[in-house]
Amino acid sequence: MNAWLTPDWPAPARVRACVTTRSGGVSQAPFDSLNLGAHVDDDPRAVEENRRRLTERLECRPSWLDQVHGVTVVEADPSRVLRADASWSAMPGVACTIMTADCLPALFCDRSGTRVAAAHAGWRGLAAGVLEATVDSLGVPGDELLVWLGPAIGPRAFEVGGEVRDAFVAAHAEARSAFVPSANPGRFMADIYRLARIRLGAHGVTAVHGGGFCTFSDTARFYSYRRSSRTGRFASLVWLQD
């Protein structure tokens, strides 16, 4: 569990954040070992134990979501699983929690350390505006926010069709710079981190940190759905400390 990641961003001291990896759990292959996804056909008892270990180590209460590649943002509630793709909280000890295995996890906080949020951004949610919706849910100006982009599929592995490129370019012409033609006709290699920065910048958020990971190629640390459709999920969490 020492292999878990701590985001490198200038967040206030009371803002805590963490990204789990594959290490430190009890799940068997192909979910080995710290799978936190209850929807991927893993042994439910293993997932329960993995989540218990997570909660015990971090001393917070994760708020799990039923993620559907949409733009709904909810207030984090550890007592139930809400259908949404982002959550926010102003309550100490409540962790906004996102599960991914190639999609982009984005963590948010305000500069005063009073609110946090987490968003799940696959290409559909990203194009539909889940990051912008998360910014709006926090109720503070964009220049008062900090964002950290967590582990997602990298630009050398994320091949998409022309319809994906068109969806982003239609909203922001600058998005053309996030797509490079692939070796396959009509296909493009997409930079999801650049796309996120473009969307956030257009919404007034410029203090964006992180990026540079690739879940597809980093087999030791991260699950990747594109690499193997039968796989686990790791979590990205952000919360306020008392």
From Swiss-Prot:
Keyword Endoplasmic reticulum applies: no
Catalytic activity entry: adenosine + phosphate = alpha-D-ribose 1-phosphate + adenine; S-methyl-5'-thioadenosine + phosphate = 5-(methylsulfanyl)-alpha-D-ribose 1-phosphate + adenine; inosine + phosphate = alpha-D-ribose 1-phosphate + hypoxanthine; adenosine + H2O + H(+) = inosine + NH4(+)
Cofactor: Cu(2+); Zn(2+)
Residues involved in Zn(2+) binding: H69, C103, H120
Keywords of the record: Copper, Hydrolase, Metal-binding, Oxidoreductase, Transferase, Zinc
E.C. designation(s): 2.4.2.1, 3.5.4.4, 2.4.2.28
Highest taxon above the source species: Bacteria
GO molecular function: adenosine deaminase activity; copper ion binding; oxidoreductase activity; S-methyl-5-thioadenosine phosphorylase activity
Family: Belongs to the purine nucleoside phosphorylase YfiH/LACC1 family.
Role this protein plays: Purine nucleoside enzyme that catalyzes the phosphorolysis of adenosine and inosine nucleosides, yielding D-ribose 1-phosphate and the respective free bases, adenine and hypoxanthine. Also catalyzes the phosphorolysis of S-methyl-5'-thioadenosine into adenine and S-methyl-5-thio-alpha-D-ribose 1-phosphate. Also has adenosine deaminase activity.
Subunit relationships: Homodimer.
Listed name of the protein: Purine nucleoside phosphorylase PA4543
Native species: Pseudomonas aeruginosa (strain ATCC 15692 / DSM 22644 / CIP 104116 / JCM 14847 / LMG 12228 / 1C / PRS 101 / PAO1)
Top-level taxonomy: Bacteria, Pseudomonadati, Pseudomonadota, Gammaproteobacteria, Pseudomonadales
